[in-house]
């Protein structure tokens, strides 16, 4: 990766991270750029022709604390394509309590893809990649954050519904439900 490409990618990723308004993002851009350089070195000819369809990710574990809950760890998964034109950020608690049977829930806090890239299918591929990586980390249910809940009838609503995201009814007999868009990655837990 040339220095000019590295600087441009860093600028785009920094802009995406700044838009999330999170305060734990130190080191993420450097690690994503390192992942991009490693991935670029082993690209196939076909992948090299369309780098916007090749995704890289970085998982960061952070320590959190508040007076009510005490301390806990939180995982932050960031995902972007090699061109840095699409970006997603997801948080999930790595803890699973087998006594309470709480599912591990992932929360998509940022999902940025342009309309042009969405038309190419990059958005759908990115969310499928995010789901696969989340499931690999043991996430049972993937939620779209409250701030991202689309208005009914909009393309975002139709798109998320088409990807299998939905809302449970208030009297859902399953042991866990939320009134926001979500998708079950693992049916039994």
Where are these predicted regions, by residue range?
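Conserved beta-strand-loop-alpha-helix junction that forms the acyl-donor binding cleft
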Residues: 143-157, 173-175
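Active-site rim helix/loop that mediates acceptor-substrate recognition in acyltransferases
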Residues: 24-80
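A conserved beta-strand-loop-helix scaffold within acyl/acetyltransferase catalytic domains
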Residues: 70, 80-82, 88-101
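Short, high-confidence coil segments that cap the C-terminus of an alpha-helix
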Residues: 137-139
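Conserved acetyl-CoA-binding loop-helix of GNAT-fold acetyltransferases
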Residues: 113, 119-132
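Conserved acetyl-CoA binding element of GNAT-fold acetyltransferases
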Residues: 102-115
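C-terminal "cap" of GNAT-fold acetyltransferases
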Residues: 149, 162-164, 168-189
């Amino acid at each position: 990766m040339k220095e000019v490409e590295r600087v441009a990618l860093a600028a785009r990723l920094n802009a995406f991270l700044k838009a999330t308004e999170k305060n734990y993002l130190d080191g993420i851009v450097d690690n994503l750029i390192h992942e991009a350089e490693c991935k670029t070195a082993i690209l196939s000819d076909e992948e090299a022709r369309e780098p916007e369809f090749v995704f890289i990710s970085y998982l960061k574990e952070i320590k959190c604390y508040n007076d009510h809950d005490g301390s806990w760890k939180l995982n932050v998964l960031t995902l972007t394509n090699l061109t840095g034109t699409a970006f997603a950020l997801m948080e999930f608690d790595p803890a699973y309590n087998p006594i309470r049977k709480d599912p591990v829930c992932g929360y998509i806090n940022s999902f940025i893809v342009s309309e042009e890239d969405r038309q190419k299918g990059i958005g759908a591929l990115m969310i499928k990649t995010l789901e696969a990586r989340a499931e690999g980390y043991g996430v049972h249910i993937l939620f779209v954050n409250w701030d991202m809940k689309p208005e009914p009838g909009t393309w975002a609503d139709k798109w998320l519904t088409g990807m299998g995201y939905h809302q449970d009814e208030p009297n859902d007999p399953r042991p866990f439900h939320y009134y926001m868009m979500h998708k079950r990655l693992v049916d039994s837990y």
